[in-house]
Amino acid sequence: MTELKLNPYFGEYGGMYVPQILVPALKQLETAFVEAQQDESFIAEFTDLLKNYAGRPTALTLTRNLSPNPLVKIYLKREDLLHGGAHKTNQVLGQALLAKRMGKKEIIAETGAGQHGVATALACALLGLKCKVYMGAKDIERQSPNVFRMKLMGAEVIPVTSGSSTLKDACNEAMRDWSASYDKAHYLLGTAAGPHPFPTIVREFQRMIGEETKKQILEKEGRLPDAVIACVGGGSNAIGMFADFIDEPSVELIGVEPAGKGIDTPMHGAPLKHGKTGIFFGMKSPLMQNSDGQIEESYSVSAGLDFPSVGPQHAHLNAIGRARYESATDDEALEMFQTLARCEGIIPALESAHALAYAVRMAKEATKETILVVNLSGRGDKDIFTVADILEAKQKQQESGNE
């Protein structure tokens, strides 16, 4: 069997911790990716789809009313304007093209919030691939509009009832299916995590976010931003934003994990700052686990950040101090969801609202002229019913408290 062409590790994190049966499939994927990156016709087709189907480049918008401090400009990288509604579409198109290049006829995917499932379904419809999406039964209930979208575009949505019936269980089932079908199917992983070469592939197919941002901010401001800020679940939108800035020491890289109901409670999803290194989902990375080493449930109001681990490159950037990772609570994200809608007429995804919350916190404390760029990773249409229910429940609670 061929040797690996790329380094599977980021410092001590990453690797390829999978059953032996999957190693040939991962090596085949790595080879196809390396060759595709050097193939002008592949790059041309990917670039064409990004431009003429997905709608790149996306805008870099200076907020008019969001910044609480006259010294601070807050820009939004508008991945919410991408076809499909979120940054997910970028790398899904890249991986679907890779699958076709390898002669695969079928795509297997997992999804939590349904955004990755929708992106996978649209890419499969466009490129004529059969599509199977594994989704936790709980998430199917929480995200019915996205389930319908996937089915409408021809995907088969398979409910997962094992474990906690959420994303980590869907990941396990998708991986199990792929083990039995990798000769004809490609597993289209939805984030910059999992076994090598997925973290590298996903980063490279998302890195145009940061590349465009750099070019756009230089045109608008004549200098680089002081910080780029992105929410972190598995970490694909954040690594897409960070990748082109890693070698720019003047730019601070800030990832925002979900603090849920509070970091001091068990109800959060912040493994980078509060987890222990372990093996999960084919990689070595920080993990939320109990004292017996069992994986603990992560929690976040946003289904897309509800993941008990994190991509290995983020773990490495954190370990070497190149990026710093903060957190925002459910309440802060809900507040920012409403604030951006009222201040700017933009409804952000609950995931992205975590990054916005930290940016506004940072802006309040600034004492000199500062430029912040927030990756607005997706739009909030998928979240309006969730938020409406939460706000209604809060209002009822207040009213009963006032009586």
From Swiss-Prot:
Its EC number is 4.2.1.20. It catalyses: (1S,2R)-1-C-(indol-3-yl)glycerol 3-phosphate + L-serine = D-glyceraldehyde 3-phosphate + L-tryptophan + H2O. Tetramer of two alpha and two beta chains. It comes from the Bacteria. The beta subunit is responsible for the synthesis of L-tryptophan from indole and L-serine. This is Tryptophan synthase beta chain. It comes from Shewanella frigidimarina (strain NCIMB 400). One of its GO terms (cellular component) is cytoplasm.
